[in-house]
C-alpha cells in the first residue's frame, strides 16, 4: 500500500513525498518529476549512503538534475535506521553510524531493503506520469551494499551506478554471490585514497560484477570527496542507456 502527499513545484521540478507499507514497515520516500508531461518515462532509483537519507543534498541535486535535464522520474527512499526511520534521538553522525553498523550485521537486512525497493518501484510506476519505462539505479557506499542485490534480481533495471564499496563487512558473501548476476551496463566510482574501503576489496567487487559492459572511474581523495564532475558524468551515463536522446537540444 502506498500513501502519497501533495505535489510541490520547486523551480520547475515536481516533488512528492510518499510512503509504502512493507511487511509492517513504513518506508518513506520522495519522488522528483519534470514540470509536466505524461509517462511512460525512465525511472531512476537513488540509494543514499550510511548516516545520510533520501533528502541528502547530493541526492536532491542529482534527482532534480535527472528530472529537469532529462525528463526522468527519480525516487529515493530512507534505508533502515536512516532519515525518517532513524532511532529517536539519534541525530549525530556517530550515533547514526553505530546504528548503521548494527543494521548492516542484522540477518535479513538486504532482503528487507530489496523488498522495500520493490514496493517503492511498484508504487511509483503506478502513477500515470511515470508508467512502465526503463529503470536505472544509482547508489554509492551503503547505496551499493543494498543496490547490488537489488539490481541482481530486478530485470527491469537496465543500467547501474555503484561505488565507494568493496567485498567486505557483514554482507561480503551476499555481494559476492549476487554481483555475478548483474548483466546491465555499470559505472563504478571509487576514491583512490579512501581510508574506509581498501582498494583490494573494491577491485574484488568490480571484478565480480557479471556485466561485460562495466568501467571503473577512480579519483584522488577520501571516501566522500567524489568530484562534482563525476556525479554529472554519472547522470549522463544513466541517460545514455535509459533514453539516448534525452536532454538533446
Labelled PLM ranges:
Residues 51-63, 79:
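The serine-hydrolase catalytic nucleophile loop
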Residues 211-249:
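C-terminal catalytic histidine-bearing segment of alpha/beta-hydrolase fold enzymes
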Residues 182, 188-190:
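Short beta-strand/loop motif that positions the catalytic acidic residue
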Residues 115-181:
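Primarily recognizes the serine-hydrolase "nucleophile elbow" in alpha/beta-hydrolase
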Amino acid at each position: 500500500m502506498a500513501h502519497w502527499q501533495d505535489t510541490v513545484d520547486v523551480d520547475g521540478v515536481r516533488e512528492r513525498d510518499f510512503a509504502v507499507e512493507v511487511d509492517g514497515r513504513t518506508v518513506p520516500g520522495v519522488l522528483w518529476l519534470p514540470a509536466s508531461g505524461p509517462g511512460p518515462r525512465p525511472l531512476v532509483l537513488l540509494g543514499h549512503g550510511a548516516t545520510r537519507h533520501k533528502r541528502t543534498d547530493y541526492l536532491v541535486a542529482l534527482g532534480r538534475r535527472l528530472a529537469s535535464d532529462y525528463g526522468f522520474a527519480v525516487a529515493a527512499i530512507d534505508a533502515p535506521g536512516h532519515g525518517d526511520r532513524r532511532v529517536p534521538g539519534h541525530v549525530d553522525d556517530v550515533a547514526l553510524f553505530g546504528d548503521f553498523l548494527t543494521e548492516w550485521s542484522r540477518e535479513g537486512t538486504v532482503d528487507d531493503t530489496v523488498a522495500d525497493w520493490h514496493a517503492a518501484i511498484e508504487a511509483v510506476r503506478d502513477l500515470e506520469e511515470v508508467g512502465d519505462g526503463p529503470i536505472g539505479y544509482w547508489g554509492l557506499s551503503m547505496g551499493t551494499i543494498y543496490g547490488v542485490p537489488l539490481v541482481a534480481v530486478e530485470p527491469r533495471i537496465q543500467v547501474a551506478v555503484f561505488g565507494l564499496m568493496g567485498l567486505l563487512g557483514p554482507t561480503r558473501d551476499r555481494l559476492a554471490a549476487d554481483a555475478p548476476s548483474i548483466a546491465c551496463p555499470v559505472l563504478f566510482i571509487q576514491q583512490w585514497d579512501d581510508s574506509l574501503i581498501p582498494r583490494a576489496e573494491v577491485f574484488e567487487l568490480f571484478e565480480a560484477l557479471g556485466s561485460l559492459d562495466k568501467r571503473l572511474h577512480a579519483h584522488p581523495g577520501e571516501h566522500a570527496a567524489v568530484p562534482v564532475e563525476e556525479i554529472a558524468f554519472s547522470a549522463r551515463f544513466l541517460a545514455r542507456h535509459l533514453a539516448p536522446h534525452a536532454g538533446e537540444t
